[in-house]
Amino acid sequence: MGNAAAKKDTEQETVNEFLAKARGDFLYRWGNPAQNTASSDQFERLKTLGTGSYGRVMLVRHRETGNHYAMKILDKQKVVRLKQVEHTLNEKRILQAINFPFLVKLQFSFKDNSNLYLVMEYVPGGEMFSHLRRVGRFSEPQACFYAAQVVLAFQYLHSLDLIHRDLKPENLLIDQQGYLQVTDFGFAKRVKGRTWTLCGTPEYLAPEI
């Protein structure tokens, strides 16, 4: 019993040390956001992966390295017209500052006269939503496997005072090893305390709301 308690305390200390270091790294990047780390002509556009109300996501290839990425292209005029400027700037600033295995990573960002570009790692497995719809339901071990990754990702985010605010199967991507990547930080925000804004996806709201 004593050994088990001591082991648990040691594991918690390791987690706390990791989160403390991660917070320091995040705060540095948060306070020193990267600007224009690439340009459009460095990428070859291959195909459209998805479209949204004010932009689209394309599969691109980096001409120099040959690496594939997902490029989110946001139309500036539509962002302004739909009053999404704050959300867009928040998304970019958060993505360039976070670093965790189960969160999608921003590799490059830049802009031109018409668009904002967020270039993220390409996650080839697609959305969890598609997999879940195909199989009907996950087994209990699968569900626990995925849930553990979501819990760890959100423990990391919440330790940085970040809230995602749009967790759903469509925003969970599955990589080539079968692990999750939380994506779409369009509603994400850094706050201390409560927020009073109703946001997210209506179909996933708690019934009592």
Curated annotation (Swiss-Prot):
One term under GO cellular component: nucleus
Annotated EC: 2.7.11.11
Uppermost EC category: transferase
Lipidation (N-myristoyl glycine): G2
Location of Phosphothreonine modifications: T197
Biological process according to GO: signal transduction
Residues the record marks as active site: D166
InterPro entries reported for this sequence: Kinase-like_dom_sf (IPR011009), Prot_kinase_dom (IPR000719), Protein_kinase_ATP_BS (IPR017441), Ser/Thr_kinase_AS (IPR008271)
Protein name from the UniProt record: cAMP-dependent protein kinase catalytic subunit gamma
Species per Swiss-Prot/TrEMBL record: Macaca mulatta (Rhesus macaque)
Lineage summary: Eukaryota, Metazoa, Chordata, Craniata, Vertebrata
Gene: PRKACG
